[in-house]
Amino acid sequence: MTPNKKGFSDDLSLWKDIFASAAQGKALVYHESTVGAGLPVLSSLKDLVATGDEVTRIEGVFSGTLSFLFNTFAPASGSSNAQWSAVVAQAKELGYTEPDPRDDLNGMDVARKLTILARLAGLEVARPDAFPIESLIPEALASLPSSADGITQFMTRLPEFDAQMANIKDSAEKQGKVVRYVGSIDVPAKNVKVGLQYFDKDSAIAGLKGSDNIISFYTKRYGANPLIVQGAGAGGDVTAMGVSADLLKVVERLQ
């Protein structure tokens, strides 16, 4: 049991080795909290596949940090005059971001979660950097060191690029939409991508609040209305719940 997503999202060979070794040793592998903390994301997907459903698309907001950032920066209801850099600073102060916000803004955390889901859906994704990932780190700031001084420089200079994010938000608003940072998997096309997309304001993704996650499973069985898993996708309490639930499953299997 582990909530650590790195082993399950690294090289495909490692993924195969983990499950091959588990099968050989008749061991159990549970990693529900690697995606969505305590939300039943992996178990829902595994159940769909195990019962013979055909998963065609998976789409959602997989980062509590990025959910908070865009729900605050570009709310679906009302308006916000907040600058992008100010929202990032607020999220950092509230503890929503990693100590270095670039670890959230580079999109790699979302990419790792998409890699795990894609593999469970039957796609042999080589690595989390094997598909398009849109980074929200301005190119001019990407090379700053990861030291405390580098983080300070990043936060100090981020306001220089507020206009870029404002233009993206304005472009969405002119179309009657909002911008969100999402991950999507097109299973038949074997296409995985992570980045910004525009959504209608009355869509489930646009209507998220706070730092909630939402994951939609489009399948042959569910048709046009996807199976949706939504709720808090980050935090110690919900992550601990996910790990504890895995532990209970192991205990039940061993009894």
Question: Could you say what each language-model-derived stretch is?
Answer:
Residues Y30, T34, G38-V55, E59-G60, ...:
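NAD(P)-dependent dehydrogenase/reductase Rossmann-like domain
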Residues N4-L48:
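Rossmann-fold NAD(P)-binding glycine/threonine-rich loop
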